[in-house]
Structure formats: structure tokens, C-alpha cells
Curated annotation (Swiss-Prot):
PROSITE patterns: AA_TRNA_LIGASE_II (PS50862). Homodimer. This is Proline--tRNA ligase. Keywords: Aminoacyl-tRNA synthetase, ATP-binding, Cytoplasm, Ligase, Nucleotide-binding, Protein biosynthesis. One of its GO terms (cellular component) is cytoplasm. The gene is proS. Disulfide bonds: none annotated. GO terms for biological process: prolyl-tRNA aminoacylation. InterPro entries: aa-tRNA-synt_IIb, aa-tRNA-synth_II, aa-tRNA-synth_II/BPL/LPL, Anticodon-bd, Anticodon-bd_dom_sf, Pro-tRNA-ligase_IIa_arc-type, Pro-tRNA_ligase_II_C, Pro-tRNA_synth_II. It is found in: Cytoplasm. Its EC number is 6.1.1.15.
Amino acid sequence: MAKELKDLTKRSENYSQWYNDLVVKADLAEQSAVRGCMVIKPYGYAIWEKMQRQLDDMFKETGHVNAYFPLLIPKSFLSREAEHVEGFAKECAVVTHYRLKNAEDGSGVVVDPAAKLEEELIIRPTSETIIWNTYKNWIQSYRDLPILCNQWANVFRWEMRTRLFLRTAEFLWQEGHTAHATREEAEEEAIRMLNVYGEFAEKYMAVPVVKGVKSANERFAGALDTYTIEAMMQDGKALQSGTSHFLGQNFAKAFDVQFVNKENKMEYVWATSWGVSTRLMGALIMTHSDDNGLVLPPHLAPIQVVIVPIYKNDEQLKQIDAKVEGIVAKLKALGISVKYDNADNKRPGFKFADYELKGVPVRLVMGGRDLENNTMEVMRRDTLEKETVTCDGIETYVQKLLEEIQANIYKKALDYRNSKITTVDTYEEFKEKIEEGGFILAHWDGTTETEEKIKEDTKATIRCIPFDSYVEGDKEPGKCMVTGKPSACRVVFARSY
């Protein structure tokens, strides 16, 4: 049974299938009766909750407050910002009626044709329109600014090709929407929140990211600038892991949100929006996990330490229980989440396989000999290394080990990412290297036409125009690898999810 539990497709054989197997077998999520909508199972949701809690703290530390806005948006609202509606029109789910009735033939329920809405409602694909319609009532003077609101919600965008966590029709996310008196303040906010996302990804998820600005072609619909964090998965593909948008005055003008400034003149408000979603779960899984299952960073693991007893009889189990009780209390006192699994309905081998599959960072085992010697076997999930350690001060040992694991999996991901960054000067070399995966730094002439040609030829897109330190040496001007026209700096290309 333990072997069946971990019978995952190997990454080297089929990376995509390995990912799908892992999400299901590790009890993170599964498909639902509704196409494109997933069920996030308790263990998967526990990881998301830890992400949510940490991000929420970081938002509040930067002065943001939470609010909630309606799920349904009048269709006319989406017509007010032309670029915005064009960007989302094909993905919108539309509510046309407000009532069902029993079918006359008794076959069930049907839509009541008499209950047609005067104006159709859109299930939110994102909330800029409904929020800016609301902000109009909240803002009259510069004294009402800034507004720094965040919303935790679900959104819906019809997706035809779905993958659990990475691309689903309904997904959970947070969306921040801020209003400012000046352009400078709004631009600073957009960058500040990108940096919050970058810190969260690297410090808590242990996922190294490249920060930069999107090309005009990849920009959020209705934004003047879109900033992004891009992560690299183990197959060399990029995953956009968070975006922050400088919206200028587009939405303020669309919804006529003006304020009296300090000079007593009417002016349109400046705006940002920013968001991350359950897609981060996909990034977490694909960055660290291996052929044995999940590898979770301790900072986000629902269970950081699991303790499993191995015993010959009930009397020995009682003695182990008594010993472990004190160890559990000491670990909890240090803020470590610990589970003692002394259930007798599964064998130790099954438990080992299950917790390995679920990525629990540290496993402690106590058997009869350990009881006599005042020791425990410690296994770390990231390297699968085992060590026998004295029970005296084991809580401090484990605390340090968790920090070491967090640092190690970040370093491993960073080393891999850096080993897969290539600089090229010619299009022929680009086409060759893109087949190997990874990030490619190359010159581009800044035109949408060249960007589209590269995408059509190679399936690679511009992930961002980077402002990260590791590409500082590539900030020099050059010539576009495709057209030979002038290029201000190298940009990051990759195939992506």
C-alpha cells in the first residue's frame, strides 16, 4: 500500500503527468462536477491558508485594509473601459435570469423565461469596475486619499484548457485596489506591492523570482504598466506568480472619480491594482517537489514536524506516548506545528510514505531502542537524510533544522534557476537554446510585431523587461536578435505556463 501511495510518474518521464499525479495523490485538489472548477481538499487548503495569513499580515503592515465587493457586476460597467472589456470579454460568465421553475413535464427545473434580467450581470473576472464605481461615492477631496483596499475572493474566467491550481475557471485570489492623489504615489504603490510579492515568494515560498515590467503586449487590460514576478519551474518553463498594475487615471475617467486637490481644483484619481492567486500553489509544488512527492518549505507547511512511534505492544506505546508528550509541548512552545501520529490503523511504513508524499519537512521516529537510549531518528524531507539525535534539547535542534531546510530548498531552486539562464545574440542561437528550456536574455527592438513573430516561431514570450540585479550587466543597449534594430536592453524570454 505504501508503494501504491507514492507510485508517481517520474519527472524525467513526463513532467506534466508527474505534476497531475502529485496534486491528486498528495490530497491537494481534485476535479469537480463543473468543468474547469476544482475542489481544493483540506490539506491543499491548509497550505493556501498559511499563504493567505502571511500575505494578509504583509498587506496590513503596508497600511492596507480588507473589504468585500459584489460577485456580480452589471454588464454596462465593463463597457466603460474599452481595453479592459476587450481583455476579458471572451472569458466572462454571464447571468441572464434570476429564477428557475419546475418543468411542466415534471422532468426537473428549467430557467423561467419570464425572469429575464433587464441588464445581464457578469460573474467577476476581476473587480476594477465594481470597485471604481464604489470609490466614486467614497472620494470627494484629497483628504479622502489614499484608499488602500484589498479583497480576498473568488473570480471566474472561462478556461478551455485547465490544470489544477495553474489554470482553472474559478480560482481564489486576493486583489488590491488603491486610489491616490498623484501619479508618483500610485507608481510607488505598484512597485511597493510587487516587492511585497517578491519578498513573500523568496522568504516564505523559497521560490526565487525575477522582477520586471511586462511588454505592452503582455500588459494587463486597462493598465499603463504591469509589473511582474516570474519564477522558473523544474522543467525550465516560467510561471507568472504575481502582478501589480499601474492603472493611471483610466478607471477614474471611466467612472468619473474626481477629487478636489490641495489647489482646490478638480482632478482624476490615480489607481493601482495587484493580485496573486491559488496559482502560487502550482509554483510551490513545481519548484521544490521530487519523485517521492511534495517538498514543502517549513514556513508554509501545515505540519512542520510529524512524530511516528514504532512499538511492539501497548505497554511500550504508552511509554513512548509519555515521552513524546513532553517533546510535543516543547516544540509547540517554539511555535512549531507538530503532529503525533500514534493511530494504530496504519503501519509505520505507510505513515512514512504518506508524510513523505505530503512534504512534511521533518519526521521524528521513536522506537523501543530509542526509548531506552533517550534518542529519536530525525529525517529531513528535502534531502531524505536521517540522523539519530538525543532527546535532550531536541526542540532546539529541530527549530534550527527547519531554518536550514528553508534556506536549503531556496538555494537549490536559486542554483537551478541560475544554471538555466542563457544570454544569446542571434536568433538562430535563440531558437536552439529555447528548446532546452530556461530563461533567455536577448535583445528585442520593442515592437509588438517582432514579439509576435518570436512567439509564433518558438512559443516563447517576453516574461519581463527585468530590473533584477542578476541582469545588471545586460542593461547595455544592443541590436535586436531578429531585426537588427536598436534595443535598449536585454529582456527575459521563456516558454511559460
